[in-house]
UniProtKB/Swiss-Prot annotation:
GO terms for biological process: endonucleolytic cleavage in 5'-ETS of tricistronic rRNA transcript (SSU-rRNA, 5.8S rRNA, LSU-rRNA); endonucleolytic cleavage in ITS1 to separate SSU-rRNA from 5.8S rRNA and LSU-rRNA from tricistronic rRNA transcript (SSU-rRNA, 5.8S rRNA, LSU-rRNA); endonucleolytic cleavage to generate mature 5'-end of SSU-rRNA from (SSU-rRNA, 5.8S rRNA, LSU-rRNA); small-subunit processome assembly. This is Multiple RNA-binding domain-containing protein 1. It is found in: Nucleus. Keywords: Nucleus, Repeat, Ribonucleoprotein, RNA-binding, rRNA processing. Residues 176-187 have a biased composition (Acidic residues). Its main location: nucleus. It comes from Candida glabrata (strain ATCC 2001 / BCRC 20586 / JCM 3761 / NBRC 0622 / NRRL Y-65 / CBS 138). The lineage of its organism: Eukaryota, Fungi, Dikarya, Ascomycota, Saccharomycotina. The gene is MRD1. It holds the Pfam family RRM_1.
């Protein structure tokens, strides 16, 4: 957590005054007046009227600064107000109280669930009542034979069987007949004739058709008239008018029948009546009522829907992330880099791409980024755990991003292209994913010969004589000469060439730096600039006078990636240019205006070539650097490291930097850490660290001054560190006895070729090219110089040189044994090592077989 909350502020305090107050502590702890960027966010909360609510949030870039602010400012005073400073909590923290919107949303959710339950209970009760009423009607019909006969008579002929009309049986009817009767009974609610018949049944349940009725008595005329009226056939005109109006015709004449524009079908639709199973009628009035109810429900549900639209649905976001595996980050720090997000998200899984959006006009960040995971489930886990968490003093907001647009061709489109075009496209696609490089300073052999020929003032054909057998040696020596000139030029421009030999992983490469190789001799700096400038602003474009290689540095990462993907293996002046990403921090000084390249034709014309002043400046700088090298003994490599052990586990890199930056020549200080297995996104100190200085003398002076001092209660111990990456590898290349081994030698190379190649760098003592039993070369050779210094010079000058198309690899060889006993001891060690390796291989190879044998023996028993 790197965000703090400050309570109890004066109501009149402004944000600049609050930042100035907290910057005082940062200036003291960091011992510098430039503390810009350490406070990433500062906000005083205000009400609707614009008045301060007397508390604020302050975001720090480092967690250590936030903890220091809490310990230092908590309980202190600003003017006359006592403030409380504490670590802020994120929205995902369960201890944070819920907002009013969340409370309203939960209350609406509870009401909705309650309404659904009540509606379900009501529907269940209605179903029970309907079933009971149907059962009662069926029972009444079964009891009364006259009513049953009447219903059977009123059925359509298609629904009544012929034998049912002739014979009457007392057996129960089939399930199908019962369903038909039930339908007729339900329709009685709408049919007035059947409804009146049922009402008649209730009035004379005790009457019987078997008894005769007398009509002769005049006294009983009135009673007989009443009974006759009941037994008469009822005409439709005598039915109540109310039922007809309610069932068929509307209450008011809408005039639709007189309207000629309305068709017959539209008029029928307006008069259509639908009968439900429970006997309810649905016409115009019922439809309007339903529409009114639906409109009321929609009007009541509008606030809830608005709240749901304002708050993103987490389930929908997770479903989208599961499809794309891509996250959208916003509210990030404008100075955040891709490496910061790689460290944050890499613990959750493999990352395919991390992209920070950059404004191409200014080169500054836009404040949002994209992270693409290899597996979508890992992206979902990162979204759940990191959304609304504090990162670099700000609340990180993560959303589900759309799927990345892919403009690549599919296999079907590739098959329709020529084979040559297919190979070019595949090479371009694989160039950005390449994790290795054969030779960083690779140069086109034709360009090398052209450069040497132009420098000597001869024709290129004169350097290579087809009748001479040592043409390959001449070409290798010419390449060595050009490589030496290129090295000197890059060193004067502040390029650290040792970084190129230590590239082991893609994470060590910088997307902004591109090495341009394999372009023809005669290519100018302006022509390369026109090739790269359309993709973005160039901070550097370094091209040696030899004109065989160049280094391009873009202002932002996005421009470098775009240029690399579009220009890799592009045809340029009849050749294919090779691009390679350079290492990080390969420049030791800032870029000058002369090295930059802008998209301006007039300016580019003025910068056609290096002026005499530039050449004199480069020569003078070289002389001053040579004098400095003579005065100060700088170890092999750009810096000298000091190993510090017995550090307190609470000591941070910032505290170590504050302790050692007062010494001259200080470069950087770092405490080695490891991931915390208990808490994700946190690290633990390993109890030791490293401090780098520019020279060995400065490092030894610091060791004598600081060795044995106490930091955070621990007495530290200091000593020089021998790094395997830079210094260690350079020390191994020192030939103590003047003998070196040359590997990757072409099989066509002879002893004479090797002798002529190395003879120009010193006096040779012996040259040996081992051969097989068929007298063919084994691919390596031994070269021994009289002086060890000459051997080191040859290894340095011939580094990266090609002989007959193969790059030579040189290493110091072991010194020959002084006597037979030493030779026997070496052979014994070698045999022991080979025996141990073969024994381990046999054990691993036979482990599975022994397991199978044991299983077979167990089965026998």
């Amino acid at each position: 957590m790197s965000r703090v909350i400050v309570k109890g502020l004066p109501i009149y305090l402004t944000e600049p005054e609050l930042q100035k107050h907290f910057n005082k502590r940062l200036i003291t702890t960091h011992a510098t007046s430039n503390v810009d960027g350490l406070i990433t966010d500062l906000r005083i909360l205000k009400n609707r009227e614009g008045k301060s609510r007397r508390f604020a949030f302050i975001g720090y870039k480092n967690e250590q600064d936030a903890l220091d602010a809490v310990n230092y400012f908590d309980g202190s005073f600003i003017y006359t107000s006592k403030i409380e400073v504490d670590m802020a909590k994120s929205f995902a923290d369960p201890r944070v109280p819920k907002s009013m919107k969340e409370k309203k949303r939960e209350a609406l959710k509870r009401l909705r669930e309650k309404e659904e339950k009540l509606l379900e209970e009501k529907n269940k009760k209605l179903k029970v009542q309907d079933t009971k009423s149907k059962i009662n009607i069926d029972a009444e019909i079964e009891k009364d034979k006259q009513l049953k006969e009447f219903i059977e008579t009123m059925k359509p002929s298609a629904q009544t069987s012929s034998w049912d009309k002739i014979t009457e049986t007392a057996e129960p009817e089939s399930g199908l007949a019962e369903e038909q009767e039930l339908d007729d009974e339900e329709s009685s609610n709408v049919n007035p004739l059947l409804k009146h018949a049922l009402s008649m049944k209730k009035g004379d349940e005790n009457d019987s058709d078997d008894e005769y009725m007398s009509f002769n008595n005049a006294d009983s005329k009135a009673g007989s008239d009443e009974s006759n009226e009941e037994e008469k056939m009822i005409s439709l005109s005598e039915l109540p008018v109310q039922n007809e109006e309610s069932s068929a015709e509307p209450k008011e004449d809408d005039g639709l029948a007189k309207n000629e524009e309305i068709s017959d079908m539209d008029w029928i639709k307006q008069r259509r009546v639908r009968i439900r199973e429970n006997g309810e009628k649905v016409g115009e009035e019922f439809a309007t009522n339903v529409q009114d109810k639906e409109s009321e429900e929609n009007s009541q549900a509008t606030p809830a829907e608005e709240l749901q639209e304002e708050i993103p649905d987490e389930e929908q976001a997770i479903a989208k992330i599961q499809k794309t595996g891509r996250l959208f980050l916003r509210n990030i720090l404008y100075s955040s880099t891709e490496d910061d997000f790689k460290k944050l998200f890499s613990p959750y899984g493999e990352l395919k791409e991390v992209h920070v959006a950059v404004d191409t006009r200014t080169g500054n960040s836009k404040g949002f980024a994209y992270v693409l995971f290899a597996k979508p489930e890992e992206a979902v886990q990162a979204y759940i755990e990191l959304d609304k968490q504090i990162f670099q003093g700000r609340l990180l907001h993560i959303l589900a991003a759309d799927e990345m647009k892919d403009h690549r061709l599919d296999e079907f489109d590739l098959k329709n292209m020529p084979l040559k075009k297919q190979r070019e496209l595949k090479k371009k696609a694989a160039a950005s994913k390449a994790t290795f490089s054969w030779n960083s300073l690779y140069m086109n052999q034709d360009a090398v010969l052209g450069s040497v020929a132009a420098k000597l003032g001869v024709q290129k054909a004169d350097l290579i004589d087809p009748e001479n057998s040592n043409s390959a040696v001449k070409q290798a020596l010419a390449e060595a000469h050009v490589i030496g000139d290129v090295r000197k030029y890059f060193e004067t421009k502040g390029v650290d060439l040792t970084k190129f030999s230590n590239l082991k992983s893609p994470s060590q490469r910088d997307d902004r730096v591109i090495l341009v190789k394999n372009f023809p001799f005669g290519t100018t700096r302006e022509e390369l600039g026109e090739l790269f400038v359309p993709f973005g602003k160039l901070e550097r474009l370094l091209m040696p006078p030899a004109g065989t290689i160049a280094i391009v540095q873009f202002r932002d990462i996005a421009s470098g990636r775009s240029a690399f993907s579009k220009l890799a293996f592009k045809r340029f002046k009849g050749t294919v240019i090779y691009l390679e990403k350079g290492p990080k921090d390969c420049f030791t000084k800032a870029a000058s205006n002369e090295d930059a390249m802008e998209h301006d034709e007039e300016k580019s014309a003025k910068e056609a070539g290096p002026s005499s002043a530039d050449l004199l400046e480069s020569v003078s700088s070289k002389k001053t650097e040579d004098k400095e090298d003579e005065d100060e003994q700088v170890v092999d490599g750009p810096t000298v490291s000091i190993f510090i052990k017995n550090l307190n586990f609470k000591t941070t890199s910032q505290q170590l930097t504050d302790r050692f930056k007062v010494f001259s020549g200080f470069v950087v200080a770092q405490v080695k850490t490891k991931p915390d297995p208990k808490q994700k996104n946190k690290v633990l100190s390993m109890g030791f660290g490293f401090v780098e200085f520019r020279t060995k003398e400065q490092a030894t002076a610091v060791i004598s001054a600081m060795d044995g001092t106490v930091i955070d209660g621990h007495k530290i111990q200091l000593k020089l560190s021998h790094r395997q990456g830079n210094a260690g590898s350079q020390e191994k290349k020192k030939a103590k006895n003047g003998k070196i081994i040359v590997k990757n030698l072409p099989f066509e190379a002879t002893r004479k070729d090797v002798f002529e190649l190395f003879n120009s760098f010193g006096q040779l003592k012996s040259v040996r090219v081992p051969k097989k039993f068929d007298k063919s070369a084994r691919g390596f050779a031994f070269v021994e110089f009289v002086l060890p210094k000459e051997a080191e010079n040859a290894m340095d000058q011939l580094q990266g040189v090609h002989l007959l198309g193969r790059r030579l690899v040189m290493q110091p060889a072991e010194q020959e044994a002084a006597n037979a006993e030493e030779e026997l001891e070496r052979m014994t060690k070698k045999v022991r090592k080979q025996a141990a390796v073969s024994e381990i291989a046999a054990m691993t190879r036979n482990a599975g077989k022994r397991k199978l044998d044991m299983e077979d023996e167990e089965e026998e028993f």
